Structure formats: C-alpha cells, structure tokens
C-alpha cells in the first residue's frame, strides 16, 4: 500500500466519528462528540480510584500527592508557615544583589506572576463551590489544610527545579521536573539515573496533555460560556460557534507564549496584579455585603470540619481544584 493510500485510510478513520454525527450537528457538537470518549478514557486511567474506607473511593494520584505533601511538611518543619515572611522578602527583592546579574531569565516578581497567572482562575471558584456543595461548610477547612500541605510540595518542586536547572551560554535557562528527575536521580546511581530519564520523558508527555486539557480547554470552555451568557445567550454570535472565540484566544495566547518565558513574564507582571486585585476586591465586596453572616459561617466551618461528609467533600474539592480544574498551583 502506498504512503498516500495509508494516509487516506488513517484520515478516513479519524473523520468517521464526525461523519457519523450527522450533517445537522454544529462544529462544536462534532468536536465534543469526537473528544468526549477520548477524554473519558484518559480520565479513567489518570483518576483511577482506591477504596479508603467508609464506602468512599479516592483517586490514587490524589492520595500519592497528599502523602508526599504531608511528608515534606513535617520533614521541613512546616516550611509553608515558617518561611512565609522569607518568601515575601524574596519576591520584594530584599536579597537581590544590584551589582551582579541574577541567574535566570526573569525577576522574582515576574516568576511569581507567571505562576499566579495559572493558579487564580476557574479552580479557585468552582473547586470551592463544589467542595461546599458536596461536603458542606466544613469542607472549606480541609481545603485550607490541603493548601498548606501543598505549599510544602511546591517548595520542594521549586527548590529542585532551581538546583538542577541548566543555564546556557546565551543566558537562557532550562529546568523543571524533567531535569531534576533525570539529573537528580542520576546522582543515586546508574539504575536510578535510567529510571529518572524514563520518568522525565513520561512527565514531559503528561505535561503536554495537562497543558492542553486542564491548562487550556477547561479555562477557555468556562470563558466561552460566560461570554455567550453576557452577549445574548442563544442569540449570541458565539452560540453554537464557540470555536471562533477559541481560535481568537489561541491566536492571542500564541503570540505571547511564542516568545518564551521572557515574553510570558512581561505580560503577566502587568496583567496578573490587576487580575488578582479584581479577584480579591470581588471577594471582599461579597464578604462586606454579608458581614452579619460571617460569624455563623465560621462557626459552621469549624463545627462541620470533622464531619465525615465534610472531609470527603473537601477531598473532592481539592481534587477538582487541583486536577480536574487544572493542576496549576501544584
């Protein structure tokens, strides 16, 4: 069979799901029908659950991350709390040497804004709402606990990323999990070094899937729904044609990220403070408008924190915020 025929067979196979939907289906419906079984299959693998007692099942990946976070929290003597002031001082540039060029491509503040740009968003709002709806107000307590534990895991990730990164002659930097997995484990012997390379490749592949799925699709999906809602609902230009808005956003984001981390940082250090400001102000407005309900809410959070339903709801909320709503912060 010639190469052209092989490509024709492959292409026809890929288009079959679209053709079977019908001519009346919109592009959005065709894409959703084509992608849904794929995403469901991936989720079945990634979020495989294990029983934890009391009739509850929890994704294994969540248990693994929590175990690691708890270990690092105790190993580093609660660094997430103890080092909070130091972290602020670093971001403010207290330890910068004005006489020497710091290693790295961006400033401490730009690194922070780049990280926050992928953290503050859908997960922070939807994750909390879902946790409370499932486990009650007490679920909020467990989400705070999980957040503090996650900070310790983030600390070790960033530390290893800095320790094992590579700075090239042109000043650019390469680093991250793929580097500290391969280079770090190599110091533990040949066998561990080979394992590190395998894990590095696996992470890189998984990272692509995560960035396309949780990192992009979830965000643009929710943004599109809000846009359609405020521009007329079923009468909106984008109703049934959400791909148009998606294409526009893809082009805008593409122009930013194609310049690498420096280009991203230049945008985030201007946009993120404004974005976070709106986020915090909006939260304060809601709290101010419901001042009389705050004492009761705090009481319900504390009293319901150790209810089994609240604990489970908190775990699910953390899972949705950190994984299904995009694993940004950790």
PLM features per residue range, with description:
Residues 45-60, 228-243, 268:
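Interfacial loop-to-helix junctions that mark the boundaries of transmembrane helices
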Residues 56-62, 96-105, 137-138, 190-200, ...:
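Membrane-interfacial loop-to-helix junctions in multi-pass transporters
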Residues 72-73, 116-117, 146-173, 182-221, ...:
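Helix-loop-helix module between adjacent transmembrane segments
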Residues 3-122, 132-139, 150:
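N-terminal alpha-helical transmembrane segments of multi-pass membrane transport
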Residues 5, 67, 72-88, 199, ...:
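Membrane-interface loop-to-helix entry segments
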Residues 99-134, 160-163, 169-185, 202-208, ...:
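Alpha-helical membrane segments and immediately flanking helix-loop junctions
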Residues 24-37, 44, 177, 215, ...:
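Loop-to-helix junctions at membrane interfaces in multi-pass transport proteins
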Residues 138-145, 265-268:
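Hydrophobic alpha-helical membrane segments of integral membrane proteins
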